[in-house]
Amino acid sequence: MRNTESHNREGSNPKEILVWDWPTRAFHWSLALSFLGSWITAEAGLEWASTHMFLGYMMLSLLLFRILWGFVGTRHAKFSSFLVSPRVFLSSLHNLFSRRSEDHMGHGPSGGWATVLIISVLLVQAISGLFISDDIFNDGPYHGSVSDGVASFMANLHHLNFNLILCLVALHLSAIGWFQFGKNQALTKAMLLGKKKGPAVLGIKSSQTLKALSIFSACASIIWLIVWLAPEPVYLF
């Protein structure tokens, strides 16, 4: 792992360059909407259970895509561009609450590890949902494939992990607000439009659209296949 790329606004003659490819941006907002939708449908009642499950499958497809894109995607989307060593991460913390603006073209050290953490907890949430039941009408596709003890563990994990996700989302939004207004870094605009100010040499030339669409199609197909291959539940009356 190596340190993230940053630049000093002064003396670098910055101009707007493409940093975030559109597949990364589409992933970000699609994941946010899928999570919001899954939260709403979970609270809305049993009649929304099918939609809730579909959104879970969508989240799995998106997360699998982002993991693969983190290895073969564009420059700043790759994990290798923003995951730093623990030593570098700890040494960067003293700048986190400083108003001094040190722009990173991609994720900074804290943002990089926060990205991995959020992906991880959402992955746990989506996977655990495959094994649980509402005990009335709807079962996850693999609920009948595990013992009652495992299903109960997955259900508890699903509900407890959701509370952790809410805490991380609140922390994430607070951090964005701090960087936006306290450190004067337009992170939301960058994730919407894909552009930041910096030296042209640090920008990306394209979003690698064909590669991204191929990978996402493969990921969605894999998740569909996993669900389709789930064994039929056996009901004992």
Where are these regions (language model features)?
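Membrane-embedded alpha-helical bundles that constitute the cytochrome b-like, heme-associated redox core
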Residues: 1-237
